[in-house]
């Protein structure tokens, strides 16, 4: 079964954004990478209902974002992004073009220079046969969209091969573990967390993905978390509205804690890193609202899986992913402890 159609472009109208991103690590050095292809279509100023003090989004555009995270020398951690003309896209097969860079369902090729860095990537992967849908099923229908952002992973855990050249240094990849996700929406959540780990020690094939949001719609709504875990041939999906009641998340600084529940399985975990292992990515919503996203691709994940035994819970597995947790915390306020910024270049 193919998941290619899940990468097809969802939006073309103004007031929307759409992102396709890939995250992965280099097995030999533990370096982490974050590659984003972005379509941004700001709100038409004539229809803007919010105060003029908001940032102007400008005309529709494409953007390329690249970040390298180095756990051995944080001075080598950096991120750069650049604006381009609006993306070109097609279906059958899916293809997205931004500048000279290309993204397909099974490959990413491109280059980006600026801020003292020169980056080139030529990457291929074997597409997944099953996707992860992070949100309740109804939200992916035209009647159930939450009205903020939708997210799914057409390629949640795939073997990636190819090369990345950064400032003249080339790293090669031979079936490294990677994940590719597709996000589309009209605005970011008031606060959110995203996290994934697909390279746990002693758990081949396992992949964990979480999405947590804290929305403000006139009043502050309760925190919501959705969690998906593939482990030992089983798929655990705590992603429906019935799970929200007992699912929990809490995050600040460089740490996220979470728990999720079904009648037979309970999952508890955390992802963490050092402040110097994060970058602040400055986003603009289509309406001009500033958003700040603190991201790392070299965090640590620690997850405990419990199975119900009668009235009690028994620990079944402990999963550890050292320097393999990819996670972020986002919101309207920048975290002052994260000092390194993802830089816009000309």
Where are these regions (language model features)?
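Structured soluble/peripheral alpha/beta segments that form catalytic or ligand/cofactor-binding pockets
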Residues: 1-346
């Amino acid at each position: 079964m193919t998941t290619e159609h899940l990468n097809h472009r969802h939006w073309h109208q103004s007031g929307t954004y759409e992102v396709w991103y890939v995250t992965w690590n280099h097995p030999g050095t533990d370096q982490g990478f974050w590659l984003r292809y972005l379509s941004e279509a700001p709100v038409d100023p004539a229809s803007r209902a919010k105060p003029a003090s908001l940032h102007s989004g400008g005309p529709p555009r494409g953007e390329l974002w690249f970040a390298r995270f180095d756990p051995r020398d944080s001075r080598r951690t950096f991120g750069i992004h650049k604006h381009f003309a609006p993306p070109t896209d097609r279906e059958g097969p899916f293809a997205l073009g931004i500048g000279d860079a290309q993204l397909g369902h099974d490959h990413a090729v491109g280059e980006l220079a600026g801020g003292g860095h020169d980056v080139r990537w030529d990457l291929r992967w074997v597409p997944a046969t099953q996707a992860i849908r992070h949100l309740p099923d109804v939200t992916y229908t035209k009647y159930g969209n939450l009205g903020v952002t939708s997210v799914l992973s057409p390629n949640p855990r795939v073997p990636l091969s190819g090369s990345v050249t950064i400032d003249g240094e080339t790293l090669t990849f031979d079936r490294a573990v990677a994940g590719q996700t597709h996000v589309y929406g009209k605005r970011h959540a008031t606060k959110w967390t995203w996290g994934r780990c697909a390279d746990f020690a002693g758990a081949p094939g396992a992949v964990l993905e979480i999405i947590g949001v804290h929305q403000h719609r006139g009043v502050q709504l309760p925190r919501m978390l959705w969690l998906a875990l593939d482990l030992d041939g089983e798929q655990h999906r705590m992603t429906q509205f019935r799970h929200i009641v007992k699912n929990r998340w809490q995050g600040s600084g460089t740490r996220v804690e979470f728990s999720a529940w079904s009648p037979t399985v309970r999952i508890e975990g955390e992802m963490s890193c050092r402040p110097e292992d994060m970058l602040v990515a400055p986003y603009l919503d289509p309406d001009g609202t500033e958003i700040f996203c603190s991201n790392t691709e070299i965090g640590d994940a620690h997850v405990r899986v419990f199975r119900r035994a009668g009235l009690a819970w028994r620990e079944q597995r402990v999963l550890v992913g050292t320097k393999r947790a990819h996670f972020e915390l986002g919101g309207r306020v920048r975290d002052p402890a994260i000092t390194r910024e993802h830089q816009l270049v000309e």
